């Protein structure tokens, strides 16, 4: 009963933050998602219990897609045959910046949530370390507040561009 009440509370909070009556589901899967077309937010149920920090992070992140990622952007990306992972990483950086602006209290939720995910090696870095990752993955980790992500001067140009993203068109360019 307590678990069902917690799921219902997260669902209500997600709807309030998203400012619409999105459909929230909890199911066994690797990560959270937001289906733009169906207006559905999926939260994972993991074999190892998901922490409050991780779940709050995922809610804050996915409602960012509900608020600021349009179906038009998804369609344009597909038409232009852009790399989905690149677009998703850049869009994640953009929408998380917007969530933090709109809901300043979310800044600490993101930090605590990403710290918890990193502790369980959610990002699959393992013993190799951040320096073994390619540029786009390091950019992703940088925006996920992972400490120790370093960039060359040339790479910093791309990080700076990502930090300045404000529109969907800028993400796609």
Predicted feature locations:
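Short, functionally important secondary-structure microenvironments
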Residues: 1-173
């Amino acid at each position: 009963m307590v678990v069902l009440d917690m799921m219902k509370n997260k669902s209500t909070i997600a709807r309030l933050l998203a400012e619409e009556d999105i459909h929230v589901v909890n199911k066994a899967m690797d990560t959270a998602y937001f289906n733009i077309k169906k207006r559905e937010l999926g939260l994972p149920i993991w074999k190892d219990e998901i922490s409050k920090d991780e779940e709050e992070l995922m809610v804050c992140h996915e409602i960012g897609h509900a608020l600021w990622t349009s179906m038009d952007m998804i369609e344009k990306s597909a038409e232009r045959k852009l790399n989905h992972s690149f677009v998703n990483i850049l869009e994640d950086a953009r929408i998380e910046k917007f969530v933090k602006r709109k809901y300043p209290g979310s800044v600490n939720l993101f930090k605590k949530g990403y710290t918890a995910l990193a502790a369980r090696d959610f990002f699959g870095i393992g013993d190799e370390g951040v320096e073994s990752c390619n540029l786009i993955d390091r950019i992703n980790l940088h925006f996920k507040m992972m400490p120790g992500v370093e960039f060359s001067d040339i790479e910093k140009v791309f990080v700076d561009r990502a930090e300045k993203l404000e529109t969907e068109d800028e993400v796609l360019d």
